[in-house]
Regions:
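Pyridoxal 5′-phosphate
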Residues: 1-134
């Protein structure tokens, strides 16, 4: 019997929990509309599902539903967060600080912000990946 491979890339993607698969299955097979296309029943059902999910997350976080934003994944989330902070703080100056070991999904938007006139400081790390606080 061949040994099963060991999967060491869970930080990028993981096996989907069977409970999530069961909950999502109807949206892959029966209610597969685009929630932005509300001119048909499939889109309306998808929008209702997204609205319900947003309300559930908002309740868990004690936040207004209109402050909950879903993204396609980590890269989009990182871009949105970094660009949003830079835009919101434009009057105070756009200086972001990150570390050299940060993920490409953070370093790339930082580089873009720098090309657009923002100030980016990338802190080096030592051999153990630690930032020297001095």
């Amino acid at each position: 019997m061949a040994a099963l491979p060991i999967y060491l890339d869970n930080h990028a993607t993981t096996r989907t929990d069977p409970r999530v698969v069961a909950a999502m299955l109807p949206y892959f097979t029966d209610i597969y509309g685009n929630p932005s296309s509300t001119n048909h029943v499939f889109g309306q059902a998808a929008l209702a599902a997204v609205t319900s999910a947003r309300e559930q997350v908002a309740r868990l976080l004690h936040a207004p539903p209109n402050t909950i934003l879903f993204t396609s994944g980590a890269t989009e989330s990182n871009n949105l967060a970094l660009k949003g902070v830079a835009a919101a703080q434009r009057q105070r100056g756009r200086h972001l600080i990150t570390v050299a070991t940060e993920h490409k999904a953070v370093l790339d938007p930082c580089a873009r912000l720098q090309r657009d006139g923002g100030e980016i400081t990338i802190l080096p790390v030592d051999g153990q990946g630690l930032v020297d606080p001095d």
